[in-house]
Amino acid sequence: MLRWAFHRWEEALHNRSNDRIVREFDWGLDWLPDLASRDVAADTDASAQDRLDAYAAAAVADSDAFFASTDTAEFDLDRQGHLRFPSQVVTPHAENNVVHARLYRAPEDRGRAVVVLPQWNSDADGHVGLCRLFNRVGITALRLSKPYHDWRMPAELQRADYIVSSNVGRTLQVCRQAVLDARRAVGWLHGQGYSSIGICGTSLGSCLSMLTAAHEPRIKVAALNHISPYFADVVWDGLSTRHVRQGLDGHVSLEALRRIWLPISPQPYLERMRRLQTLLVYAQYDLTFPVRLSQSLVQEFRTRAIPHQLAVLPCGHYTTGKSPFKFLDGYWLTRFLQKTL
């Protein structure tokens, strides 16, 4: 009965948005400028799917190169705490090529800071309350705008469709961009004297946070809020991405999509999390990050004996943002970071 009630509530909250667009399928090879330069993908007579398969396999095999980040000196922090810096990845949209972040300083942070990545389609105020909650326990927070979100969204968009869509190559590249942006944000915090740095992400932000933590040695702890081992499976089976699935259907199988999007999935990088302290959070009645996927990732951590803490929310995905569940979620995230940073 309780499951049925939460699922009905989740569906109702999902249906409040009527601006979702089913976009045309595209392999998106033009979004991967280094595709032709990789020997494994250089056979231009191969099909688009085969080329992306080879590209993804090479990216996972050398993920340090795929997610290699270069620091920049071009940071601009204004008096309101708005930080801007150039993205390492250049896309066709000028707005998206400038990274925006908002700094929330804790009065006595003792060198502790966390990069915060909100959920997919969050607006500019998403997770600001959480940042201020972190401030209350002495942790400075840097709230990062993901690619194609809020300040970075071109006029042609109403939603952040270009980071998760039926354009396969674009999704791969823009999620990679998000990780490189987060690594530059960590570099800025480190340059400001912060010695104990964590990362906290929700939903899509959680996936990107784990990818960042797995490849950024300056990150010590990761709080992952809504979890799955595979990017493709969430898009394929999740409530929030039904319209994306519609654009994919008939063009690519789940198995093929899982292979192509493996570089932006947590699964290949689990062993890299062994050096960190990690909090895994999932919701018991989640339809967007299906519970079987969340439990699968938890089991992977357990089987491999990777250090972690676990919290299970008694709600769904959308309802995590509703009272009283948002307070419980915030408490678990804050307590974890307070104890581990």
Regions from the language model: what does each represent?
Residues A94-V99, R105-V114, R136, M273:
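Proline/glycine-enriched tight loop/beta-turn segments at coil->beta junctions
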Residues D237-L293:
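The feature captures the conserved acid-bearing segment of alpha/beta-hydrolase catalytic domains
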Residues V179-S195:
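Conserved acidic catalytic loop of the alpha/beta-hydrolase fold
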Residues Q295-L341:
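C-terminal catalytic histidine-bearing segment of alpha/beta-hydrolase fold enzymes
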Residues M210-A256:
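Hydrolase active-site cap/lid region
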Residues V116-R176:
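Cap/lid segment of the alpha/beta-hydrolase catalytic domain
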Residues G201-G205, S209:
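Gly/Ala-rich beta-loop-alpha elbow adjacent to hydrolase catalytic centers
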Residues M1-R84:
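N-terminal targeting or regulatory segments adjacent to alpha/beta-hydrolase or S9 domains
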